[in-house]
Amino acid sequence: MSVNRILVINPGSTSTKIGVFDNERPVLEETIRHDEEQIGKYKRIIDQYEFRKETILEVLHSHGINISKLNAVCGRGGLLRPIEGGTYTVNDAMLEDLKNGFSGHHASNLGGILAYEIASGLNIPAFIVDPVVVDEMEPIARISGIAGMERKSIFHALNQKAVARKVAEQLNHKYEDLNLLVTHMGGGITVGAHKKGRVIDVNNGLNGEGPFSPERAGTVPVGQLVEMCFSGEYYRDEMIKKLVGQGGLVSLIGTNDAIKVEQMVEKGDPEATLIYKAMAYQVAKEIGGASAVLHGKIDAIVLTGGLAYSKILVDEIKERVDWIADVIVHPGEDELQALAEGALRVLREEEAPKEYIVREKETVARG
């Protein structure tokens, strides 16, 4: 089998994770920590790309990586327009939306730009894979009870789809042939209904929908939320923080550290026990609802993300949902590996690269 060497780039707010893979095998994985004072010199996140590019190249050189031997560069997908899942070639339309922050400004927007900047000088392809804006929801799933307020698809697409593919392989099937319920449990929690390779419904794990999580509120009583918003006690930013960042376990028990909460549970703390069980209860309830989306025809339920390492949490969830389908646990997440595998599928011609096309007010993914 021929060897494809792939450079993978995953930018964060103060760090850049990079990996070099020979096919699926990691040759180098490193987290580059950026000096906050250095980063602070740039007015916009997007202005950091040249600095980060040079830093990446220096690190590769220091490890003896010859970039002329690369076959492709793959970056973390950023806040683009809604697109279907898959591996996309970085093109001018995508670069424009990433640079302009079409759907928001975030460090992940640098992923496609850095991939392109490095790849173009080597005359090799640049890709992104399954960004958080992946949207494969069916029309019926978008409807909410208020006109003009459509449900949105924002979830852990990269890890959900990567793990779903691994489970399909484990079951000796193609991802596109199975119905799976995939639950990513980390700082946020998302439950996706995967129907034959498409996530046709999923809770918005960012903006207050679904189970509460270590630091997100999830679905809350809307009437009480409206009263709180107009009580005059809180600014808009404070309310947003209550939903994202200071919600969930942070609000209920004062920490987003699930390990600490587990220790409290093991010591018999009744409040911690009730709250941790409530989080598992809400995850199980979301899985149960998602099973109806797939008419109860489920090949497997998959639990993944950092919280899937928690035996207490996993056992609580299993107890409530294992009657629906077998529960398969794939703890943790490996974004670098997932990005490399997405690029590899295209390089091996197992799937065609998709093209990011902007037509007036819509984005079209053309395979």
Swiss-Prot record:
It catalyses: butanoate + ATP = butanoyl phosphate + ADP. GO terms for cellular component: cytoplasm. Keywords: ATP-binding, Cytoplasm, Kinase, Nucleotide-binding, Transferase. SUPFAM superfamilies: Actin-like ATPase domain (SSF53067). The keyword Acetylation does not apply. It is an enzyme of class 2 (transferase). It is found in: Cytoplasm. CDD domains: ASKHA_NBD_BK. GO terms for molecular function: acetate kinase activity; ATP binding; butyrate kinase activity. Its EC number is 2.7.2.7. PROSITE patterns: ACETATE_KINASE_1, ACETATE_KINASE_2. GO terms for biological process: acetate metabolic process. Coiled coil: none annotated. Pfam families: Acetate_kinase. InterPro entries: Aliphatic_acid_kin_short-chain, Aliphatic_acid_kinase_CS, ATPase_NBD, Butyrate_kin. Belongs to the acetokinase family. This is Probable butyrate kinase. The gene is buk.
